[in-house]
Amino acid sequence: MDRSIMPIDSPARDKPPDELVWPLRLFLILLGYSTVATPAAILIYYVRRNRHAFETPYLSIRLLLRSFAVGNPEYQLIPTGEKQARKENDSIPQTRAQCINVIILLLFFFSGIQVTLVAMGVLQERIITRGYRRSDQLEVEDKFGETQFLIFCNRIVALVLSLMILAKDWTKQPPHVPPLYVHSYTSFSNTISSWCQYEALKYVSFPTQTICKASKVVVTMLMGRLVRGQRYSWFEYGCGCTIAFGASLFLLSSSSKGAGSTITYTSFSGMILMAGYLLFDAFTLNWQKALFDTKPKVSKYQMMFGVNFFSAILCAVSLIEQGTLWSSIKFGAEHVDFSRDVFLLSLSGAIGQIFIYSTIERFGPIVFAVIMTIRQMLSIVLSTIMYGHELTFLAAIGFMIVFAAIFVDIHKKYSDKSRGPQRSW
């Protein structure tokens, strides 16, 4: 039986996983990635050593290799104009009208992220948990079990969508100053972060998962100091810790806290994996913001294309080495409605990326981390309302703590705006 196909009645394995398995799996993944990274590193070294031989005004393979390994540093001297300078300084609105516009924009991004992620969750659950009928035997159903193929399809659709947008507005795009390979860092960290997150679910209890995910804001701030040299005041760190505490209190006290979690222990492996998830996720957000801050900045569609290009390569290499790429394609060809669901899942993910990159570009990684925390809380609130569950007193206190911390931070930024430009989360 193909590895991408699971019997419809396959039982779940409840016994604790072997803690020696995940390091081996991670090693094999990194070994597979090295088959791409090593030749790429050699190519980058060669082009950088002979960069003058690759300088040409014409579109050719030499120009593409130069853009990949060296970038276009000569465009860094181009004046970016008052419009961009003004945009970098308007993160804190100075008037009530600007404040309303920023709030509307933030709510629009939040709604877009919420809708696309909910759609992805529904479609992914449909694909993974339910069987698909064979086109030649309608009474036979098979489950699809290769989640990495779904990620690969998501990257391909996002790659095509970003390429179409770039082709349409090519003349409006800023010069891409950094070398193209810098997007591979985002792809790698995002891939490893997702892997650590899913792998950690086998080793950590629900309370540990909750506290770690709620701490994402603080970890993102610390990583911002390391990656971008962004300085935060003790007051801002205090607000971040307060948000983490309030979110943890809410999520741990909500009536749905036991849903989807059967692990009652937390092992050392689980803590390592959760730490890996938080660190790589925080690096991803801050590295993207660092690229957005280049002058002229990288556009969100350039970012989207570069990240998905390298992510698609990494996923393809992994699928080929595991022997599941062709079996997954064969599954789609042989089963009714599977290709449709995968396309809708991938399209939802691609549109969601546009909202995510727009949020990071406009408001920064900290705001995005806060949005994801609030999104998780609102999902529980909506579930509580829809199914008639009761929201506990401690959960309500945690909910109020989170929004009080956000309000206090915003109020302080407005109070201090007369002292000069302030940092924005």
From Swiss-Prot:
Any one GO cellular component localisation term in the record: endoplasmic reticulum membrane
Predominant location category: Golgi
GO molecular function: 3'-phosphoadenosine 5'-phosphosulfate transmembrane transporter activity
Membrane topology of this protein: Multi-pass membrane protein
Intracellular or extracellular location(s): Golgi apparatus membrane
Residue intervals passing through the bilayer: 27-47, 102-122, 147-167, 232-252, 263-283, 303-323, 342-360, 365-387, 391-411
Pfam families: UAA
Keyword match Transport: yes
Any single biological process term in GO: 3'-phosphoadenosine 5'-phosphosulfate transport
InterPro entries: SCL35B1-4/HUT1 (IPR013657)
UniProt keyword list: Golgi apparatus, Membrane, Transmembrane, Transmembrane helix, Transport
Top-rank lineage group of the source organism: Eukaryota
Function: Mediates the transport of adenosine 3'-phospho 5'-phosphosulfate (PAPS), from cytosol into Golgi. PAPS is a universal sulfuryl donor for sulfation events that take place in the Golgi.
Family: Belongs to the nucleotide-sugar transporter family. SLC35B subfamily.
Name the UniProt record assigns to this protein: Adenosine 3'-phospho 5'-phosphosulfate transporter 1
